[in-house]
């Protein structure tokens, strides 16, 4: 079992420390669903999903602020994404606000935001959207080194009357540049990472989180062909430890937690279902993974409360998802399961041993 001493030791787990929500921009300080209306040439925007050139289209964003008053901002929208852009009936968008207009509003500090929409019309797709949103929120509970999110009950109105209006749940994601400024980080534009270039505590926490949601669609070592490292992980550094890269994950629609109809595990893994957890984390120096596990366990009650308390999640989805999340904590709390399903499956054991041997031989490095 993870000892009580380990659980109490999380105070030394630096990057996972909690940060006052007030340090985030106003939009991301509140987790209640924001009511908003997007009025724009949506059909024109969607029509560019397969185009090499995807233009911004002008529109308006109207929302209800915390005092109950209606506020209107100019916004431009552009289709974005990769797989979902081509596959989904309702592809994701990028919102571009005018900096001069957002001052003094709930959107203070916002410029460009990713908008995540349900893949299709219908209740089931909205529930899947909620589960991806909850994946982001789960990681926010585990560490302040995470993307802020805000749930939105969004009405879409086509300004050209080319399609019918509709209302769906959606959410926006904190911009990379804003995250970097908030955490005083620099984005690392690299093609790949070596094991010794990663910040170990953060990497261990990220990979335990990926196990929680059963996400196999990521990497902390490489990016897709022609893209910066890493796949569905943004790399950052901080000035005082510029040689150590901090991964921050995003895009969780392929996870077992969401269980999208199009999601499937990588062919090289010995599993057939995306909801089957299979640990792909890197082996870590002594104590690092233990501390990360202790930290995750210390957040168990808060994580479960998140899933229990969100009103937009249906009773069926809530019960099924709570059982799935609880089964993850059951692995971490059982010594035999932890050894078999996590510790014995870590990758790069030989590289880690070689690195530790080199450090022991030359302690000045």
Predicted segment positions?
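Hydrophobic h-region of N-terminal signal peptides that target proteins for export
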Residues: 9-20
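Sec-dependent signal peptide recognition
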Residues: 1-10
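Phosphate/dinucleotide-binding and metal-coordinating scaffold of catalytic cores
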Residues: 19-365
């Amino acid at each position: 079992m993870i000892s009580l001493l380990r659980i109490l030791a999380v105070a030394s787990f630096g990057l996972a420390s909690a940060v006052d929500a007030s340090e985030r921009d106003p939009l991301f300080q509140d987790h209640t669903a924001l009511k908003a209306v997007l009025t724009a040439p949506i059909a024109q925007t969607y029509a560019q999903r397969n185009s090499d050139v995807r233009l911004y289209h002008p529109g308006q964003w109207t929302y209800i602020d915390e005092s109950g008053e209606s506020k209107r901002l100019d916004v431009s929208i552009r289709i974005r994404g990769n797989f979902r852009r081509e596959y989904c009936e309702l592809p994701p968008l990028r919102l571009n606000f005018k900096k001069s207009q957002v001052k003094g509003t709930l959107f203070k500090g916002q410029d460009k935001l990713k908008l995540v929409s349900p893949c299709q019309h219908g209740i089931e797709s909205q529930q899947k959207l909620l589960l991806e949103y909850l994946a982001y929120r789960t990681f926010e509970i585990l560490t302040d080194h995470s993307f802020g999110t805000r749930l939105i009950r969004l009405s879409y109105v086509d300004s050209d009357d080319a399609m019918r209006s509709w209302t769906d749940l959606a959410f926006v994601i904190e911009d990379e540049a804003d995250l970097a400024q908030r955490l005083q980080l620099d984005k690392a534009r690299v093609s790949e990472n070596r094991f010794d270039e990663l910040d170990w505590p953060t990497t261990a926490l990220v990979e335990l989180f990926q196990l929680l949601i059963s996400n196999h669609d990521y990497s902390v070592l490489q990016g897709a062909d022609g893209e910066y490292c890493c796949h569905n992980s943004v790399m950052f550094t901080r000035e005082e430890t510029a040689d150590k890269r901090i991964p921050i994950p995003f895009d969780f629609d392929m996870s077992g937690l969401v269980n999208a109809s199009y999601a499937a595990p990588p062919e090289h893994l010995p599993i057939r279902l995306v909801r089957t957890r299979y640990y792909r984390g890197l082996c870590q120096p002594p104590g690092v993974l233990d501390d990360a596990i202790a930290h995750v366990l210390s957040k168990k009650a808060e994580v479960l409360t998140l899933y229990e308390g969100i009103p937009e999640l249906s009773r069926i989805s809530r019960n099924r998802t709570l059982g799935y999340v609880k089964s993850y904590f059951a692995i971490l709390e059982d010594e035999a399961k932890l050894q078999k399903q996590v510790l014995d499956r870590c990758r790069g054991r030989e590289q880690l041993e070689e690195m530790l041997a080199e450090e022991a031989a030359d302690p000045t490095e």
